[in-house]
From Swiss-Prot:
Keyword Iron-sulfur (UniProt): no
Pfam families: Complex1_49kDa (PF00346)
Enzyme class: translocase
Molecular functions per Gene Ontology: NAD binding; oxidoreductase activity, acting on NAD(P)H, quinone or similar compound as acceptor; quinone binding
Bilayer topology annotation: Peripheral membrane protein
Function: NDH shuttles electrons from NAD(P)H:plastoquinone, via FMN and iron-sulfur (Fe-S) centers, to quinones in the photosynthetic chain and possibly in a chloroplast respiratory chain. The immediate electron acceptor for the enzyme in this species is believed to be plastoquinone. Couples the redox reaction to proton translocation, and thus conserves the redox energy in a proton gradient.
GO cellular component, one term: chloroplast thylakoid membrane
UniProt keyword annotation of NAD present: yes
Subcellular locations according to the entry: Plastid, Chloroplast thylakoid membrane
Major subcellular site: plastid
SUPFAM superfamilies noted in UniProt: HydB/Nqo4-like (SSF56762)
Protein name: NAD(P)H-quinone oxidoreductase subunit H, chloroplastic
Classification of source organism: Eukaryota, Viridiplantae, Streptophyta, Embryophyta, Tracheophyta
Quaternary context: NDH is composed of at least 16 different subunits, 5 of which are encoded in the nucleus.
Length: 393
């Protein structure tokens, strides 16, 4: 009789590509020794659309509808970064009212993005209920977006020198009501999730990133702040009107999946604080640069004719990008979203390099999952928070 032999071969498993509503078209080739992860290789590129090359033969305004397809769950941020560059190159002043409207839209977009991170993250861990709860609040945010911009997603709302339209009548009151309601929703999430022993068992001490490690990998956003580094571009770069509001940077020391969860949950309440202050202190005046110039002019009949009201007003002025280099960045929900642009005395940029936070944060995944269990891969991947449109571009 032959003695039974135990196989020692490593097993290779394909995880993904998954449905776009979860982690998108990310494929992981995982090498397993039993339940333990030996190696993990992310395969990217399934959603590559050549966004950087498209930018090189479009004016900024023509390119705006494309940028909402990078991170399609936080489209206000991609629009903001696209128009911030030309504004700095051309030294274009943004009216105070427009800046406040931008801040409100950006923070609503941040909350919507974090909500759609929370639902699938909890579903990955095995908690199905929060997945349905988050859509309730997210729908209210999309209603606000639809009332202000005409679109639930892909808003195309930002313009060089301001925004496309003023806030409609009654919108501010509706938004304040949402803020009051949403704070109770966050408290409900805290009660349901944060102290849940099963949840804590799945995330505590899983996927730990040290302070130095986070810096060396170039991580940003909640991934960086969860590792004990108090770095938020809204405080560092002083862009838009963030200096005028009272709010705190959310950060944790532990660097594990639980810390990343706590940072994002904390950011939602801080965003509500910013929105409430902006809504209560929003100044009057023009909502875009063209309107501001109009107010400064004498009463001239040319401003009231058909062409101005229906044609000239809609696209922002197309101007040549001067021959210089510029790097602009904003604090997006997933981290530092940046653009390195080179002008060439043309209406088209000569080079348009995107720095997507999701792509850079994803690089640390193979190191985090090594020597972990197979079930921990989804916990760690979920805590990183990636959108493949932004990763592949």
């Amino acid at each position: 009789m032959t003695a039974p032999t135990t196989r020692k071969d490593l097993m290779i498993v394909n995880m993904g590509p998954q449905h776009p509503s979860m982690h998108g078209v990310l494929r992981l080739i995982v090498t397993l020794d039993g339940e333990d992860v030996v190696d993990c290789e992310p395969i990217l590129g399934y959603l590559h659309r050549g966004m950087e090359k498209i930018a090189e033969n479009r004016t900024i305004i023509q390119y705006l509808p494309y940028v909402t397809r990078w991170d399609y769950l936080a489209t206000m941020f991609t629009e903001a970064i696209t128009i911030n560059g030309p504004e700095q190159l051309g030294n274009i002043q943004v009216p105070k009212r427009a800046s406040y409207i931008r801040v409100i839209m950006l923070e609503l977009s941040r909350i919507a993005s974090h909500l759609l991170w929370l639902g699938p993250f909890m579903a990955d861990i095995g908690a199905q209920t929060p997945f349905f709860y988050i859509f309730r609040e997210r729908e209210l945010i999309y209603d606000l977006f639809e009332a202000a911009t005409g679109m639930r997603m892909m808003h195309n709302f930002f313009r060089i020198g301001g925004v496309a339209a003023d806030l409609p009548y009654g919108w501010i009151d509706k938004c304040l009501d949402f803020c009051d309601y949403f704070l109770t929703g966050v408290a409900e999430y805290q009660k349901l999730i944060t102290r849940n022993p099963i949840f804590l068992e799945r995330v505590e001490g899983v996927g730990i990133i040290g302070r130095d490690e986070a810096l060396n990998w170039g991580l940003s956003g909640p991934m960086l702040r969860a590792s004990g580094i108090e770095w938020d571009l809204r405080k560092v770069d002083h862009y838009e009107s963030y200096d005028e509001f009272d709010w705190q940077v959310q950060w944790q020391r532990e660097g594990d999946s639980l810390a990343r969860y706590l940072v994002r949950i904390g950011e939602m309440t801080e965003s509500i604080k910013i929105i409430q202050q902006a809504l209560e202190g929003i100044p009057g005046g023009p909502y875009e640069n063209l309107e501001m110039r109009r107010f400064d002019r004498l009463k001239d009949p040319e401003w009231n004719d058909f062409e101005y009201r229906f044609i000239s007003k809609k696209p922002s002025p197309t101007f040549e990008l001067s021959k210089q280099e510029l790097y602009v960045r904003v604090e997006a929900p997933k981290g530092e979203l940046g653009i390195f642009m080179i002008g060439d005395q043309s209406v088209f940029p000569w080079r348009w390099k995107i720095r997507p936070p999701g792509f850079i944060n994803l690089q640390i995944l193979p190191q985090l999952v090594k020597r972990m269990k197979l079930a921990d891969i989804m916990t760690i991947l979920g805590s990183i928070d990636i959108i493949m449109g932004e990763v592949d571009r």
